[in-house]
Design a protein with these regions (language model features):
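Chalcogenol-based redox active-site neighborhoods
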Residues: 1-140
């Protein structure tokens, strides 16, 4: 909580970075809980999970504690990381177009190379798709 994160310092780790729209909302809670419920798979296979949204550090701390997430949630209030991964997209909310985070997940390998991206995903069953892909690459 409250610490700076550096992608460069994560070389040597397999990263699963998922971007989600908002803390403590139904879809984002579902997605986070699916990552939590499959925590053993990720840790047993040396994957580090990071969730990112534009919510504040305090909001993340509250959400993480409430849901007992075993992984870190990173705050990107400035949208710099969101823009780097190109996940800020126009959305239609109650008839108005607003800019928001498109639910997306990225797999970055130990060398820091982007290996897979899932963009514009639905929260339900998304984590299963990620795990299926990772199981395939673990077998090769």
């Amino acid at each position: 909580g409250g610490q700076q994160f550096s992608l460069a310092k994560s070389i040597g780790k397999n990263l699963i970075i998922y971007f989600y729209p908002k803390d403590d909302t139904p879809g984002c809670t579902t997605e986070g809980l699916d990552f939590k419920n499959n925590w053993d798979f990720f840790t047993d296979n040396n994957f580090t999970i990071l969730g990112i949204s534009r919510d504040s550090v305090q909001s993340h701390e509250n959400f993480k504690q409430k849901m007992e997430f075993p992984f870190e949630l990173l705050s990107d209030e400035s949208e710099s990381v969101c823009k780097m991964f190109d996940v800020i997209k126009p959305k239609n909310v109650y008839g108005k177009t607003v800019l928001g985070i498109e639910r997306s997940t990225f797999f970055i390998d130990k060398e820091g190379i982007l290996k897979k991206e899932w963009r514009g995903v639905k929260a339900a069953n998304h984590v299963n798709d990620v795990i299926s892909y990772l199981k395939e690459i673990l077998e090769t």
